[in-house]
A protein has these predicted regions:
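Conserved acetyl-CoA-binding loop-helix of GNAT-fold acetyltransferases
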Residues: 90-93, 99-112, 135, 139
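Conserved acetyl-CoA binding element of GNAT-fold acetyltransferases
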Residues: 82-95, 147-150
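A short helix-loop-beta-strand connector motif used in the catalytic cores of GNAT acetyltransferases and
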Residues: 46-58, 87
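Conserved GNAT-fold acetyl-CoA-binding loop/helix
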Residues: 25-45
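Conserved beta-strand in the GNAT
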Residues: 58, 64-73, 87, 92
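Conserved active-site alpha-helix within GNAT-family acetyltransferase domains
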Residues: 104, 128-146, 151
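A short beta-loop-alpha structural element at the N-terminal edge
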Residues: 5-19, 30
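Conserved GNAT acetyl-CoA-binding A-motif
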Residues: 114-125
Length: 155
């Protein structure tokens, strides 16, 4: 395999990032019956690419974007020890490229950016039954701290 390049996203990457986002949606639909049918968007990627408080990165192999991720600086709740934290999202690697360390490289780039901004707390969300993602994040050092629960009163 060619070299994997992790770089900051630019506006010209928007279409590829939107494809990554739709890959996430397709993968997550089986975990969440509350998602609307058709094309949906989790993120405003066009804004995020140019925002100062967000760092969007892409993973490239042979000039093709095969993965993505972002870190967005958020204000912490006043009862937390830290004032700010980074929320990670749009974490995606194309299925045929998984298992090659790309997600680890994306995470490392995001962690480095967070350190440069004096952010010491990282958070992300993952579906309870998305065991491959949970294992990957735990391997990277994340620990589960809260379980979200839902109930549909019309189900």
């Amino acid at each position: 395999m060619s070299n994997i390049i992790i770089r900051e996203a630019i506006p010209g990457d928007l279409n590829a990032l939107l494809e990554c986002e739709q890959g996430i949606v397709r993968y997550e639909r089986p975990f969440d019956g509350t998602l609307r049918d058709g094309e949906i968007h989790y993120y405003n990627l066009a804004e995020m690419i140019v925002a100062d408080h967000v760092h969007v990165v892409v993973a490239e192999v042979d000039g093709k974007i095969v993965g993505s991720g972002y870190a967005r600086i958020e204000k912490a709740n006043p009862y937390h020890k830290h004032e700010d934290y980074a929320y990670l999202g749009c974490m995606y690697v194309e299925p045929e490229m998984r298992g090659k360390g790309i997600n680890s490289l994306v995470l490392e780039a995001l962690k480095n950016w967070c350190r440069s901004k004096n952010i010491t707390e990282l958070r992300l969300e993952v579906y309870t039954y998305n065991e491959p993602a949970i294992k990957a994040y735990e391997k990277a050092g994340f620990k589960p701290i809260l379980t979200w629960m839902r109930m549909g009163l019309d189900e």
